[in-house]
Amino acid sequence: MKAIIPVAGHGTRLEPHTLTLQKCLFPVAGKPVLEHVLDRITEAGVRDITLIIGHLGHQVKDFCLTYENANFTFVEQTERLGLGHAVYQGLDHSDEPVLIVLGDAILELDYNNLIKSQYSTIGVAPVP
């Protein structure tokens, strides 16, 4: 199984902070949000990860060079046409199952059970 993680957005609601730091790299509990996401999915056995980058994408690449538990592929979304477009750009159109995870959201999901499901599954968590 591979994962697609879209992290191309500008994070306009977090400006001016996102003018200099990609929002998936904002620190939460001592490490970037993206690191929390990567830790959760690699613990579930996902190692092949495609990141859809755009705004400040070089920062995401630099961070991933320091992360040792995964194999990364980067796809640049040059035209911002929404989340669906970003995910579509990351698909390789193989029959391999794909886990799509947002790179700027820390969710308490059981990724092991989600991955083991024989059905297409949507993981949804309430936002307080």
Task: Describe these PLM feature segments.
Residues 2-5, 13, 27, 31-102, ...:
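Conserved N-terminal catalytic core of the sugar/cofactor nucleotidyltransferase
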Residues 9, 104, 126:
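Active-site glycine-centered loops adjacent to acidic/histidine catalytic or metal-binding residues
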Residues 15-17:
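Glycine/threonine-rich flexible loop motifs
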Residues 19-24:
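Short alpha-helical oligomerization interface
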Residues 107-128:
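Conserved core of the sugar-phosphate nucleotidyltransferase
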